[in-house]
């Protein structure tokens, strides 16, 4: 099948903070050189305090979201507690690894807060699973995003600072990567809850960058 005929999501960012994590994505989905969607959803809530970002094939990513959301709910029903983020990503890694001959074309970030504190893991299409200790980006705009993240990340960053940094990183990626654009979604997760940031608040941050 022609790979250009698949819907693809692009740039995502994750930042580990002192008091939680920040996950952020832009909203464009492409099909080859065609902008197929300007409102693509790329951040999904998997558990009360866990989110997942997706880059790559939209269909493959949505399949994984459905699978892992169900597994997370089943774990909670059986154990009366949430699965750890490391446990969740190990399960995802096993699913992806089992598909290695017919790979699901995705890059994933799974982040949140559990009994071990804030954490973000990145996963590739083959099931490679890395715990990120600072900041991470995936997708076609990640080289530009990394330039900002490497320059501005600092130890002890809090979620409000992390939110501003994530928006700045995506803003720079969107300026140079034609497959990224059409606005930014941001989620911050702390021990107090999972919060999707209002568009107006994101727009205020963007205005200060221009």
Swiss-Prot record:
SUPFAM superfamilies the record matches: N-terminal nucleophile aminohydrolases (Ntn hydrolases)
GO molecular function: threonine-type endopeptidase activity
Enzyme class: hydrolase
GO cellular component: cytoplasm; proteasome core complex, beta-subunit complex
Subcellular location: Cytoplasm
Major place of residence: cytoplasm
Propeptide: 1-9
Highest taxon above the source species: Archaea
EC number(s) per entry: 3.4.25.1
Catalytic activities: Cleavage of peptide bonds with very broad specificity
PROSITE patterns, A to Z: PROTEASOME_BETA_1, PROTEASOME_BETA_2
UniProt keyword terms in alphabetical order: Autocatalytic cleavage, Cytoplasm, Hydrolase, Protease, Proteasome, Threonine protease, Zymogen
Positions annotated as active site in the UniProt record: 10
A Pfam family hit: Proteasome
Coiled-coil portions: none
Modes of activity regulation: The formation of the proteasomal ATPase PAN-20S proteasome complex, via the docking of the C-termini of PAN into the intersubunit pockets in the alpha-rings, triggers opening of the gate for substrate entry. Interconversion between the open-gate and close-gate conformations leads to a dynamic regulation of the 20S proteasome proteolysis activity.
Subunit structure: The 20S proteasome core is composed of 14 alpha and 14 beta subunits that assemble into four stacked heptameric rings, resulting in a barrel-shaped structure. The two inner rings, each composed of seven catalytic beta subunits, are sandwiched by two outer rings, each composed of seven alpha subunits. The catalytic chamber with the active sites is on the inside of the barrel. Has a gated structure, the ends of the cylinder being occluded by the N-termini of the alpha-subunits. Is capped at one or both ends by the proteasome regulatory ATPase, PAN.
Biological role: Component of the proteasome core, a large protease complex with broad specificity involved in protein degradation.
Alphabetized PANTHER family for the sequence: ATP-DEPENDENT PROTEASE SUBUNIT HSLV (PTHR32194:SF0), METALLOPROTEASE TLDD (PTHR32194)
Family membership: Belongs to the peptidase T1B family.
Protein name according to UniProt: Proteasome subunit beta
Organism this protein belongs to: Methanohalophilus mahii (strain ATCC 35705 / DSM 5219 / SLP)
Lineage per the UniProt record: Archaea, Methanobacteriati, Methanobacteriota, Stenosarchaea group, Methanomicrobia
This protein's encoding gene: psmB
